[in-house]
Amino acid sequence: MKKVLLIFLLVFLIPLSACGGVKYEFRDGVIYEDEKEATGTFEFKIGKYRTKGKFVDGLPDGVIEEDYENGSIMMKKFFSNGKHLKDEIYYRNGQLMSTYLKDKRMDIFYDDGQLVMSFNLQTGKSSSYHENGNPLFVIAGTKSTLYNENNEILFEVENGELIDTGTILKELEDGTFEILKDNKIIAKVDAKGETITYLYSTGEKLMTSSSVSGDTEIFFKNGDTFFKGDSENGKWFYKNGKIFYEFYKSKWRFFDTEGNQILSNFDEITDIKKID
């Protein structure tokens, strides 16, 4: 999940653009005009989206704004004399998708305003959330905790060791197992002990995890997938089933509510123009 923090880095891939014989390029976060650090207001494309901002002595200053095709704001990146301060990412309907305060905090939202994930960059704590706003999965240092929608702990691990939360393992006649807490079934385990399925308080499937493949899948209460992946790749989904965010090793992509890619860390920068 920490990989999701990469979305807020301004990645410049050294594309070139010629305008009236003048050559512009981005290199290591600096904009150059005929090999000299440039000052002025520039327009360019990141992927297919138009971006505009002011640069002073090659460094971004003020607000760098990226827009959707219809002209609505997709992202604002705030700088002061080249220092990155914060980011705001928006859905097409104007609702915040994400806020990022450099070195402090990041929050990610669905288009209805629901908080999906949060990251405290000072403590290293990361959290994902149920639809009712309660924490779902929390990582704090070496401790990981899974909660049901009523904020009740289903399991807790620290330093790779399972913490006793008062659960009981019960074997059934067919060789499968149930995990009980306070005389209530909170999880089920297959006969081989390879796949465990944690449950919502009302019995719906919340999360499945395989000790063989390493695959994990988390579900909304209606049964649709919220997340699926392993240690090297993962996908998060909107409530409508469309993909929201995807990472594979060092690559990542963000998508709008219709499943269209809007941001990635491998977008090319093209069509650089100085407008002021």
Residue ranges of predicted features:
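Positively charged n-region of N-terminal signal peptides that target proteins for export
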Residues: 1-4
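Bacterial N-terminal signal peptides
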Residues: 7-15
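Glycine/tyrosine- and acidic-biased, solvent-exposed loop/turn segments at the edges of beta-strands
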Residues: 14-276
